[in-house]
């Protein structure tokens, strides 16, 4: 392969493994935090002795005062950020602790941006638009999927236009990420399935991205291998600690990969489904992934053949194209095995919206690193294939 200059961004400090949550208080201390805004959702806050309660325990044990904002919604909205910012300012917080999956992490990043930048958040959509440092962010992760705890991406929904927008900046990187698989035990099967397919999409899109490099390739390949071997088990038995730990590790690797290699049309298209229909992000990715993969296959069949082998397919004696086709079959079979809906029509999507969603998908920042350049008609056709 040809080598070029590339950068590689991850949070300053990353903790992984059982009981990793125990470091959250001391890490906030080391970052100079006196009063934390804990950003989460009402469902997580209601769980007795769950991730929120454990985080509160270790923060208070370290002498950190805490104000709680639990108004985060799925596909976090600009209004969630506005409400969280009001708490951050009213309580005079100086550090942000996010607890949950991608929605609390993205909302927390949005609060940090809004606290340090003037004007509407939408004006910062794009790459490296932020000019000021954010408050320190400590991200406590509870799902194996979005990997927002280790990325520079902040994905929010404009409630007026119902369009998701992405603010990509190294300033969004949490100061500390915490992945404790014990916090993931007992998550519902449907959530595990959706977030797991989100992680697979991250790994696949990073691996075939135009911006891939040797380091992101290594992370993405191991993530694909781990997901293929562990996602079914994690869905089947949520208390399977080995499967949970492997999925948490896979999600972390996939996040490190796409944080630097970027993504592609699956995410660009899924963002339209999330913005317009409030569809769970992992489900949108899972439905679209096989169809976008088929579209992208001719751009890099060698890497799709690699994906097939990483997912356990026997490609001995096959041509590169035939081996690449097996990757699509393996992705589809995994999605079906774990109960992911297979058609957009079953999720309330309207065909009449495809032209608009195709237009907006090509404007999404994730579209620019897709390995095959498409037009609105081709993107609309992929939506129809998934319908």
Curated annotation (Swiss-Prot):
CDD domains: PDDH. This is 1,3-propanediol dehydrogenase. It is an enzyme of class 1 (oxidoreductase). Disulfide bonds: none annotated. GO terms for molecular function: 1,3-propanediol dehydrogenase activity; alcohol dehydrogenase (NAD+) activity; metal ion binding. Homooctamer. Its EC number is 1.1.1.202. Signal peptide: none annotated. It catalyses: propane-1,3-diol + NAD(+) = 3-hydroxypropanal + NADH + H(+). Its cofactor is Fe cation. The gene is dhaT. Keywords: Iron, NAD, Oxidoreductase. Pfam families: ADH_Fe_C, Fe-ADH. PROSITE patterns: ADH_IRON_1, ADH_IRON_2. Belongs to the iron-containing alcohol dehydrogenase family. It comes from the Bacteria. The keyword Phosphoprotein does not apply.
